[in-house]
Amino acid sequence: MSSKKSAPGSANIAQNRQATHEYFIEERLEAGLVLEGWEVKSLRAGKAQLKESFVMLKNGEAWLFGAHFSPLPSASTHVQPDPTRSRKLLLHAEELSRLIGQVERKGYTLVPLSLYWKQGRAKLEIGLARGKKQHDKRAAEKERDWEREKQRVMRRG
């Protein structure tokens, strides 16, 4: 059975599925994005990718790097769009200071998880994450295979 695609204009824009495979997500946060007009139009059209993106903390601010927002030919006629430019993330000061402490002292990393609409504004879900080792990935894959096999047996029996 194929899964349904999200309807145009739905809340979810893009997801970083690779993040859950590569990292243990320990905490999830919502951040706003500073965008240009052509980027908003691209997001409305669903032309965004988070696959190679990452979040960095610089000078007490959070920045999204490597996210690709494909420019629409009709929306970016008077500007030179940069699809992979760095975008500032909007977080509360106490959230930022807590994240800076955990990233610098405890060895966590910040990973973009999904991009979605909330009350007409684009939001980015970021995860405070710890990297998985190779054996952790293998264990997670075995667990998924076992769950799939259990479901198969339950359907037959």
Curated annotation (Swiss-Prot):
Q: Which GO terms describe its molecular function?
A: RNA binding
Q: Does the keyword Membrane apply?
A: no
Q: Which Pfam families match?
A: SmpB
The scientific name of the source species is Methylococcus capsulatus (strain ATCC 33009 / NCIMB 11132 / Bath)
Gene designation:
smpB
Entries under InterPro entries matching the protein:
SmpB, SsrA-bd_prot, SsrA-bd_prot_CS
Query: What name goes with this protein?
Result: SsrA-binding protein
Q: Which residues form a coiled coil?
A: none
Q: What does this protein do?
A: Required for rescue of stalled ribosomes mediated by trans-translation. Binds to transfer-messenger RNA (tmRNA), required for stable association of tmRNA with ribosomes. tmRNA and SmpB together mimic tRNA shape, replacing the anticodon stem-loop with SmpB. tmRNA is encoded by the ssrA gene; the 2 termini fold to resemble tRNA(Ala) and it encodes a 'tag peptide', a short internal open reading frame. During trans-translation Ala-aminoacylated tmRNA acts like a tRNA, entering the A-site of stalled ribosomes, displacing the stalled mRNA.
Keywords on record: Cytoplasm, RNA-binding
Basic and acidic residues: which segments have biased composition? 137-157
Q: Which family does it belong to?
A: Belongs to the SmpB family.
An example Gene Ontology CC term for this record: cytosol
